[in-house]
């Protein structure tokens, strides 16, 4: 199903009906609205103006549109900030962050909790049973603009409380953090500060607990809104729109309080911002890197326990990346189908019409500011027609499971130990390899059941909790575990049995030394799949297991016991490809070697093939299959769908 | 005429007479002094020490030197700052900027207005009728060190007042800024903050109004001094020394209150700092880029309504650029003649003698700290002799007019939309092409009359006010309008008729989509002048006009109706050259193709040819002309002057 | 002799005896401890817990280990900071720096002086006569994390007092700083601020005095502790562990109050951080640049007036550089011998066992966190055995003396005048050339006697005080003086006789102009040793001396009178090599041309040869010598020692 984001408060009332009719005519079913409308609803404290929203919802109902109503808490009005200036967040540099953009509130502020309670309860009471309203979006893009972590006095108080609840006694905290180091022993929770502007680097356990706390605060704030909504909106779903390449927040935890996950998909903006070589940024500037959207579809499908929406889909140039190219013709359609192939229940575009004013005036929509349709309009028209003709079977499980961990991102952010070590880069490089191999991936948090997967990939899991170890133990496929896994305890200490810590139960080896390498320093390795040059990270392993791959100085780089493998280095793309291909073959997953711009995705018996490249490619379909969309010859930026049984 | 900057307060009194005699002997007529002398004049509050300056001026008078007296407000003394700490400016990061350098005051400070009134009135009363004093310089280099924009409480108050005066009602402001976006609706002007340290980017209309306000505050402060001076200094001119490559301030507006403009010309420092490829920085390290000084001469001649001085001319290495090379021998003479050829009424060098102490001790002067003459001394001696032998006809109009707009710089600073889009880079690349074509350029603000110019160039003019449109309509030459022109209303909104907005009256086309491109992503275009590869910026145009140049995907890049042309992309230097050459030929301007280091400038019937390059070049003079300086063979870093009729 | 750093407070008491026994078994004699143990000693204010340290020291005594006891002032406990929050330092940005790392105190804080007096006196009283305690280390790495320079109110007060003591009258200060420039004349010392956050750059004399003050404050604080210790610890030495490539602090001055110097040697970390081309960083990533440790050995031997220790020697990967590679096998042994060859009295490793917790958990030690020995353990075992078999003669004087000046580093930090001008880079490039020439270097502060050295090198000495001039006058070898020497007075002014100022007594020439060059702008020079291309810096010299080397435009680059030479440019490595080789030959020092990775060091009749390279090299030993370690064929990362008479 398709939807769109709409801001009735931006347009004259006489245009609403016409817009809603045009949405329906285009084939849209959902409309999201309201998420930045606080000052339109409450222009002065307590004087609620419901009228316009009443009329919008009635009109939507009349036109057959289902409304997702956003709570407006991402943008507290100026009067609220002036009344409670302490709700403004404080950045890592200790500077109060001002009103004038959005997300100008601290998750720990008691005053903001009260104001949130007031506006959300009012909203839910008034519209929770409105027939047009099918669900709610809580707030908008939690954490955007670096807002998960705040350094204000309210956060300091809340952090101290969080620590007290976690540790019980200050001695337990001292032991966990190793505060005996550098004389940091605390006598009371009230002595603990927020870890910023320290003279030397802060204690890593202190930082990790603070990052956990900050993520927890967002979750608690979301939960606070969810509870208010549930009370007043029977039968309505509640979701939130997560972001791409964003790790400050643990989406798996937060989504436990949601009905499903949603995310905002801007493939071109992400491609310009992600750490790719410049030539790849240029190569994919108009299509987005072929795995960027797919990765997040899989991630948020996991986060949503199988259910997800794309709440904001890029329909044209955006305004917030360093460079904002125009999508190649066909890409909006392709991205939509990629989302659907991955199981998206709804793809909702951002936005119905480009606003001619304010911060996002350069972000394109379905319609231009002069009310004429944009390119994307016609591409979506086509998707809507195609969709109505194509019955979608439910998506099954993927052959590959990937374990993704927000906490891992925090651990390595705190302690990279090598400037090039980036958690998301490692995860994405594993993910990309499977896409090139034509293999679908399901993404799980640590501890999720992994049974039934032919191949389980753990790019890196520094902290291995009991449930994660159990899940890995019970996996019945091949399990490949990446470097630095098991290298820390939950307290951010080196485990007593040294790395990989608890994983030694599965992989009897010890990592006795690690090193990070400067750019240009490559180690050569050799094995059954050829020779590979490695950089970034290397580990020394003591074990009785014979290495499957060795550095030329003799050190092992890949070890295996039974179905468990351990990779003791940052893998080069070439090694990763050879290794994953080999394991996939062993697991009977029938990997392919797809052309550079081609990607596949199955949904039940349907196979979707997407051509992100600039040349025609042949669909890797068995002879004689029936094509439901397109045909064997896939033009650039186009797709084909066929049925395999 | 020639002059020099002198700091009598830096030297023992017994040296003054000798210095003044030496200046006259060198052929100098003007001496600027006093602009940093506040604490020498008023070492403690209210205790004025006029004696030394009395003696300096009498001596100057005796020696036949005409004095330009600076008001000393760029450097309030420490006692003043201690008495009124609130005059210290606050930077964008919210930090109070301290005493210890210069320009440590806020233009909005009421206390500083009072202190300014006091010292300037005293100065004007005492010296406004002194026979040696021929004019005043207000303050020094307004805006230097990022001081146009201040974020202090006084500025906040003043900004609120400025908005109230502009908009009248807060509803008008809300509508203009589109504050309905992100719930930023204000109820009162007292709610509006300065746009900094916001969590997400601030509203662009808010930013633009703040930048306008900040520029206005400087103008008002200058006007405040001008009024004080006019009252007490009959017949004396008033000017200000503007800076190079500086856009925070609108010089056209400020100069309306001056008798003429002046600027400070440091070709080597600017060349090291401007955004050139490193190889060009090296190429021009000892000469300055050949168009840097010329561009500013033309700009400030326009700002000065035809009249300008060079108030500070670089005579040797400076101290403030990342690299400070020595000018090639001959360059001080060449720069001087370039200024004169552009119509400079006076070229005044900075400074008479290198100070052995304090911040600028590494900045060379005419004399070394040991009182010996520097290289520049002898070059200027030669210029003075040459000048006295060469009668200078008045300068006429140039064949090309270029429209320059400070507001355009602000718009693109606020909303580059592509990291490489820089207003000055675009303007300078147009300007440089005409210099290479041997064509003089006059520079105007938008709205100035453009009649009589064979070619009018508008590199980019995002906000097209009524008077600018009228002036363009009444131009009688060819008019080339660059990308993003007409793309914003005065309110910083997309115009209702979409870009190029009001320009559609002249150019019936619509820009329906724009994009910025990452470095390395080039689009190919083809047309009558060849094939060109473009990056940075592209626009999609809907129009019935046939394109003169097309991208290889068919999109038009250059459109024309009658004498108006629209360029829908960031031009490559190659295209710009071909296009401007072709238009100049059509306009009958007889463009040439000058060698890389050669530049021409006419002043009446005189043609000046400047050789910035390291090789001898031949002067492009018709056969048989009379050479007034040099001859047909121009050595490196030298010049020739001949008469054409 | 060998030692190790140990943190008993990090380990269970039952392990101490076992650890001490293992240290002795390994051949270690010294153990440093206690320097971060304040909160272990005084967990709450006034409640001292001596018991554990009593037992540690008694145990050390019993096991035959000599203890170096650190004063714990680098890490004041949280309760102390909470009681006196004003001890926290303030950074250049004006931000209070928080508790949570280490070195969170201001050297000017009266409260911290009191607390220091209390804890150091208690410690000295209790342990100053303990038989295990042979000496004290004051604090730890003074200045680490940018803590020499603080911008707090206490420092402002102290700086004003320091200025008053230095100048006596404010007029003297005004004259010295040239405050007449930019109206900065002060009426009272109480008007002077700390030089930061100024609108334009601060006055250089102001900055230099502040940098001197800041260095003096550290020295005074150290002296304060030394006095407390001397009173209570008869016969115990007092030292401090200095850092590498660190210039904020003048180590020569501070060490006047110590018995000898110590320093912390981390060759790999320094190599990753120093300004080397990336390819050299890669080349030496696992060995350290071959001259990094040697340079500091020579520097701190000079600082220690002939006596120094390595207090912390890197034994494996560290955690604080951008990249932290593993040392090549053999390097820990090689580094140890390099230190000993340079005269180190003790080499003490950091640390006995890798801590599994807190900030330095990724820094390797002799033992892993699981109590197993690391690679370094076995290398040191070998060194200990070799040491006991090799009688070490005293080290003699080197043939080359190098003059090193912290103040020079400050002058050029304040006024680089060219972005690439870095004092340490210049010094290190001179030093490296002599290492390649097989010539030892002694390092002195300006003013030290230089008699007996065949060659004296002054890379750059901007401020030449009377005693420095005298020492150079009395040198009896060749003296090469580098660019910008003599270019400033003690007041940070250009000397009246212009540069090289007082050095004109030795070198009758005047530097009449200087310039810095952008990268890529090279000047060609030619002379007896060939042609060389130069960048970065060039000077113009007026003199009757004929140049030994000329730029191709005729300007001289190298001048000589008698045994004094002046170099008027930033030297290229090629020129430096040719020049130093030639001078060394003239001086009869018998320079060699060593292979790239080979280095020599004499200690009495012993010659040590170190192979930092990856290939076997031949020892440059005369035929027939006796090898005491290794032999003529030196494997990679190995050494040889032979006797020459
Ligand atoms: Zn907060
Ligand atoms: Zn202000
Ligand atoms: Zn301080």
Swiss-Prot record, chains A, B, C:
First-tier enzyme category under EC: hydrolase
EC number: 3.2.1.23
Catalytic activity, reaction form: Hydrolysis of terminal non-reducing beta-D-galactose residues in beta-D-galactosides
Binding sites annotated in the UniProt record for Zn(2+): 106, 150, 152, 155
Keyword set, alphabetical order: Glycosidase, Hydrolase, Metal-binding, Zinc
pH-dependence annotation: Optimum pH is 5.0 with ONPG as substrate.
Domain of life: Bacteria
Binding site for substrate: 102, 140, 320, 360-363
Active-site residues, as the UniProt record annotates them: 141, 312
InterPro entries membership: Beta_galactosidase_C (IPR013739), Beta_galactosidase_Trimer (IPR013738), Class_I_gatase-like (IPR029062), Glyco_hydro_42 (IPR003476), Glyco_hydro_42_N (IPR013529), Glyco_hydro_b (IPR013780), Glycoside_hydrolase_SF (IPR017853)
MF (Gene Ontology): beta-galactosidase activity; metal ion binding
Entry keyword Coiled coil: no
Any one annotated GO CC term: beta-galactosidase complex
Entry note: thermal dependence: Optimum temperature is 70 degrees Celsius with ONPG as substrate. Stable for several months at 4 or -20 degrees Celsius in the presence of 10% glycerol. Activity increases continuously from 30 to 90 degrees Celsius and drops dramatically at higher temperatures. Retains 50% of its initial activity after 1 hour incubation at 70 degrees Celsius. Retains 90% and 50% of activity after 30 minutes of incubation at 70 and 80 degrees Celsius, respectively. The residual activity of the enzyme decreases to an undetectable level after heating for 30 minutes at 90 degrees Celsius.
A Gene Ontology BP annotation from the UniProt entry: galactose metabolic process
Role description: Hydrolyzes chromogen 5-bromo-4-chloro-3-indolyl-beta-D-galactopyranoside (X-gal), o-nitrophenyl-beta-D-galactopyranoside (ONPG) and lactose.
Similarity comment: Belongs to the glycosyl hydrolase 42 family.
UniProt protein name: Beta-galactosidase BgaA
Organism, scientific name: Thermus sp
Gene behind the chain: bgaA
């Amino acid at each position: 199903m398709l939807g769109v984001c709409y801001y009735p408060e931006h347009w004259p009332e006489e245009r609403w009906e016409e817009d809603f009719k045009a949405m329906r005519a285009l084939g849209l079913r959902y409309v999201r609205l309201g998420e930045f409308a606080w000052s339109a609803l409450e222009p002065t404290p307590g004087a609620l103006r419901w009228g316009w929203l009443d009329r919008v919802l009635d009109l939507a109902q009349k036109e057959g549109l289902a409304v997702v109503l956003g709570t407006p808490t991402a943008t507290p009005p100026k009067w609220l900030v002036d009344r409670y200036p302490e709700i403004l967040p404080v950045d890592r540099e200790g500077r109060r962050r001002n009103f004038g953009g959005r997300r100008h509130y601290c998750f720990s502020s008691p005053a903001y909790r009260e104001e949130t309670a007031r506006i959300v309860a009012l909203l839910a009471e008034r519209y929770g049973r409105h027939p047009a309203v099918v669900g709610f979006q809580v707030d908008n893009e939690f954490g955007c603009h670096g807002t998960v972590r705040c350094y204000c006095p309210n956060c300091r108080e809340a952090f101290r409380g969080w620590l007290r609840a976690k540790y019980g006694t200050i001695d337990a905290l001292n032991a966990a953090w190793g505060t005996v180091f550098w004389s940091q022993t605390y006598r009371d929770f009230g002595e603990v500060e927020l870890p910023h502007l320290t003279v030397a680097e802060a204690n890593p356990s202190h930082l990790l607990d603070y990052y956990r706390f900050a993520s927890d605060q967002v979750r608690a704030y979301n939960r606070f809104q969810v509870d208010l909504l549930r009370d007043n909106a029977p039968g309505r779903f509640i979701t939130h729109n997560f972001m791409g390449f964003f790790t400050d927040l643990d989406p798996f935890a937060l989504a436990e309080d949601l009905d499903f996950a949603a995310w905002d998909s801007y493939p071109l903006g992400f491609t310009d911002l992600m750490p790719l070589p410049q030539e790849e940024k240029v190569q994919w500037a108009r299509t987005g890197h072929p795995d960027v959207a797919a990765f997040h579809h899989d991630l948020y499908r996991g986060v949503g326990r199988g259910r997800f929406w794309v709440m904001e889909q890029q329909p044209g140039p955006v305004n917030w990346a360093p460079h904002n190219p125009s999508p190649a013709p066909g890409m909006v359609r392709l991205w939509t189908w990629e989302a659907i192939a991955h199981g998206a229940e709804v793809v909702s575009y951002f936005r119905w019409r480009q606003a001619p004013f304010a911060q996002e005036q350069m972000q394109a929509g379905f319609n231009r500011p002069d009310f004429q349709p944009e390119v994307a309009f016609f591409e979506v028209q086509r998707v809507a027609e195609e969709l109505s003709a194509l019955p979608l079977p439910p998506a099954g499980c993927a052959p590959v499971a990937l374990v993704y961990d927000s906490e891992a991102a925090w651990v390595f952010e705190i302690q990279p130990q090598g400037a090039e070590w980036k958690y998301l880069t490692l995860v994405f490089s594993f993910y990309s390899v499977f896409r090139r191999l034509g293999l679908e991936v399901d993404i799980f948090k640590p501890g999720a059941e992994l049974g039934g997967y032919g191949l389980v990939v753990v790019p890196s899991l520094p902290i291995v909790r009991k449930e994660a170890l159990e899940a890995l133990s019970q996996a019945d496929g091949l399990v490949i575990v990446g470097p630095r896994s098991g290298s820390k305890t939950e307290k951010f200490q080196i485990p007593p049995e040294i790395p990989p810590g608890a994983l030694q139960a599965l992989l009897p080896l010890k990592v006795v030394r690690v090193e990070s390498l400067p750019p240009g320093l490559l180690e050569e390795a050799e094995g059954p799949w050829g020779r590979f040059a490695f950089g970034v990270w290397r580990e020394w392993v003591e074990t009785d297991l014979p290495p499957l791959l060795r550095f030329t100085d003799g050190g092992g780089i890949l070890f295996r016991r039974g179905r468990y493998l351990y990779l003791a280095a940052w893998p080069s793309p070439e090694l990763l490809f050879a290794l994953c291909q080999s394991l996939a073959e062993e697991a009977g997953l029938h990997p392919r070697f797809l052309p550079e711009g081609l990607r596949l995705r199955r949904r039940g018996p349907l196979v979707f093939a997407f051509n992100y490249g600039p040349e025609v490619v042949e669909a890797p379909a068995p002879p004689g299959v029936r094509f439901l969309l397109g045909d064997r010859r896939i033009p650039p930026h186009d797709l084909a769908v066929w049925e395999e049984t």
